[in-house]
């Protein structure tokens, strides 16, 4: 009879997990849809003009080439390569057009000349009243798509069900950034608010889709929240101390002119970049610690609060070194070209390390590392409370004690009011 009861409990738990799983997916889709509608309110996007509409095409024939002399710079010669291309998309699909690829001598790196079979983007340009099709770019996105597909296949092979859930969570994460977060920024809405909303959605959807709705997921979510909160606080404090303007590069200047009536808050954009850049590492640390401590709880059967907390801190010490390196190296790698350029043309090391662009990159790495460090003890403490019986008793006893104190205060007030009434009655009787 007990085995039947256990089996029915397992079935009910698995059924609950499936219901929560599908509800999470449904709520995520609904959340993205509503969030996109709100974020796109009054959004001003840079629309493509007719002259810059790109078409996918394939080079079918090279028809010739000629040298071009530049009169404003004597001795400078360029080259124009003429070719035929077959358009493969849109209303002009299967149309063969005459196109040109222009080279100028001012390009520092020699570009690849087109050849038959190349997949390229072309656009129609109008010069001196004459229209011609011009080479725009090589199509590079196809290779990226294939690389992503290979990555997804490997996830499915090695991860199986977890691999599929990982792909699903990645899709939701990307959609949250591109359908909610970026449109909200471009529409001039509060960047701090949308950063918090995006972080909440990414953490909740990722943990509930990849993992079950259990104590481990709860501990991970609370650990992530603590790390993100620390990142918020440190960024706000440091922002006022080091006098950031948000003008870290040329792209930042261009952002100011997107909305002249209501310019984008560049400092807030730097802030959101720091938080969103660190959230992945924070989630990684939180789930690693909560998962490992859950296994410890299962093996020890009845571990103490101290055992879980100590184990969590030990695991965290092993994780924090590599994860901090991961964050710092990721930021250095993403801006390596600019760092090399600034290092080459700035003779003063003091000036170099006070440039806002360098300071912002260092700040991103440091704030992310602080968030990781705070997530380790926070997740360990939360796991110790949730996973252990004495931890739960400690929390419930605190709540019960508070309830008792509130009740006693109420009783004291009632007794005090009765005493006052009694005194008034006695005074009236004497009179």
Residue ranges of model-derived segments:
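Alpha-helical transmembrane segments of multipass membrane proteins
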Residues: 27, 31, 177, 202, ...
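Alpha-helical transmembrane segments and their helix-start/interface "positive-inside/aromatic belt" motifs
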Residues: 15-22, 215-228, 322-326
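Hydrophobic alpha-helical transmembrane segments of membrane transport and translocation systems
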Residues: 318, 330-431
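Hydrophobic secretory-pathway targeting helix
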Residues: 1-49
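Extended, hydrophilic extramembrane loops/domains of integral membrane proteins
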Residues: 105-142
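Generic detector of multi-pass transmembrane helix bundles and their immediately adjacent loops
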Residues: 232-367
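Transmembrane alpha-helical segments that form the functional core of multipass membrane systems
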Residues: 149-256, 264-277
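Structural detector for short beta-strands of small beta-barrel domains
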Residues: 50-79
